[in-house]
Design a protein with these regions (language model features):
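Short, small/polar residue-rich loop motifs at catalytic or cofactor-binding pockets
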Residues: 118
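C-terminal helical cap and adjacent loop that interface with cofactors, partners, or active-site loops
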Residues: 141-161, 165-276
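Non-transmembrane alpha-helical segments in soluble domains
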Residues: 14, 67, 71, 123, ...
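Predominantly a Rossmann-like dinucleotide-binding segment in NAD(P)-dependent oxidoreductases
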Residues: 2-113
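Active-site beta-strand termini and strand-to-loop segments that position acidic
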Residues: 122-128, 152
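Glycine/proline-rich active-site loop of Rossmann-fold NAD(P)-dependent oxidoreductases
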Residues: 77, 130, 144
Length: 276
């Protein structure tokens, strides 16, 4: 399960892509860009475990939020497959600076040493030649973003702030606010569940994520996301670490489907009208 697959902009982009508005899809950009410094140094919750990874690992530790929705749009595991990646990281500076500026003398956390690069950048190539940029950035001051850029021969969507340009619809060389197109291209699942999901976690996408899972189980139908998707998204973590540790050498992405990705039909969210 990946809740960001169900955020409203991501599902609208999925529908727009299915309708062909962006043309042939060629490139996507995504990531998890979130200033977590204060959270990482708390004496509770994530502060009890999250820094430990930064002491011994260097790579992209959290690709799923950004890559999940992009993989859906690009038909990964359902017509295309991740082929190989290269990854590199900046030096590690942000957590050390936070130590010096915010922790009192004598705090045991001041003695910790970190190896995680503050910004990790990964490029992925698919078997059909598409490219995906994935970023991980949680140790520096910045506003939140998952980027979510999807680009094709006829246009693109770019998130944070959410904006769209579609040739023949948008003014030449200008962005349109995504809200200007939402009435026409909003995903029907959001239209169905908007009131019921109001007030739920992360703007309602957590509710829709759970609703879709329960609906699949009750109806005995395949879930929107399966174990092969989970494996594909998760393996990015160790593969980026290997590439970073080996001068950004390319590393192949395993095919957990054993070739069945070429046979499986395109994703259509359960309960939504199929786009032909």
């Amino acid at each position: 399960m990946e809740n960001c697959n169900y955020d409203r902009p991501e599902m609208m982009v999925f529908r727009m892509a299915r309708l062909g508005l962006f043309g042939e899809l060629l490139h996507a950009e995504c990531g998890y860009l979130h200033d977590l410094r204060a959270i990482k140094f708390e004496d509770k919750d994530e502060g009890l475990w999250r820094r430990a990874h930064a002491m011994v690992r260097d790579g992209n530790f959290y690709p799923t939020h950004g890559l999940g929705p992009v993989a859906n749009v690009l038909d990964i595991n359902r017509g295309d497959q991740l082929d190989y990646l290269v990854s590199m990281s900046t030096p590690s500076r942000g957590l050390q600076q936070w130590q010096r500026e915010h922790l009192p003398p004598g705090d045991s956390k001041r003695a910790e040493q970190y190896v995680q690069g503050d910004v990790n950048t990964t490029m992925i190539k698919t078997l059909h030649g598409k490219t995906i940029y994935v970023s991980h950035d949680t140790n520096l001051p910045r506003p939140y973003s998952r980027i979510h850029m999807v680009q094709g021969t006829q246009g693109l969507f770019h998130g944070y702030p959410h904006r769209v340009h579609v040739e023949g619809i948008s003014p030449d060389h200008q962005w349109e606010d995504w809200m200007d197109l939402r009435d026409e291209y909003d995903h029907p699942i959001w239209a169905q569940l908007e009131e019921r999901s109001a007030g739920a976690g992360h703007g309602g996408m957590d509710y829709i994520e759970d609703y879709q899972l329960v609906r699949a189980l009750r109806e005995g139908k395949p879930t929107d996301m399966n174990v092969y998707d989970a494996a594909m998204l998760s393996v990015i973590c160790p593969l980026t670490e290997w590439s970073v540790a080996n001068r950004s050498q390319p590393v192949d992405v395993p095919d957990f489907t054993r070739g069945r990705w070429a046979e499986w039909p395109r994703l259509e969210f359960l309960g939504a009208p199929v786009v032909e």
